[in-house]
């Protein structure tokens, strides 16, 4: 599972899975096991805002920190995403 970054944000790794690149750009947030069970899933819009599809076990504070991080770094994250997927942002589908 490709990680967007090798470090954690609010205690979670941000990543995507190779089988989910058929969807528009999104970010999973999970613990060190990188399991989808209990993970959060954020769809990313072209302005860096996100739509939370699944909150998993994350608290409101953790979700807010991750959303803020994505908003600041979404273009860099999209470059990584685009290496594996031809799908664009959530609001461009």
Each model region followed by its residue ranges:
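Short, charged/polar N-terminal "headpieces" of proteins
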Residues: 1-25
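Residue-level signal for the start and early helices of compact helical domains
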Residues: 5-7, 16-18, 33-35, 49, ...
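Short linear sequence elements within intrinsically disordered, low-complexity coil regions
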Residues: 12, 20-21, 47-48, 79, ...
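Intrinsic disorder/low-structure terminal segments
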Residues: 15, 41-42, 68, 89
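A short, structured beta-strand/loop element
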Residues: 18-61
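Acidic, low-complexity intrinsically disordered segments
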Residues: 54-93
């Amino acid at each position: 599972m490709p990680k967007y970054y090798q470090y954690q944000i609010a205690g979670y790794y941000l990543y995507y899975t190779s089988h989910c690149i058929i969807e528009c750009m999104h970010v999973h947030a999970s613990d060190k096991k990188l399991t989808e069970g209990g993970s959060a899933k954020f769809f990313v819009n072209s302005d860096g805002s996100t739509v939370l599809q699944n909150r998993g076990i994350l608290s409101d504070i953790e979700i807010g920190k991750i959303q803020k991080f994505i908003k600041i770094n979404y273009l860099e994250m999209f470059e990584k995403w685009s290496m594996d997927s031809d799908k664009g942002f959530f609001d461009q589908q």
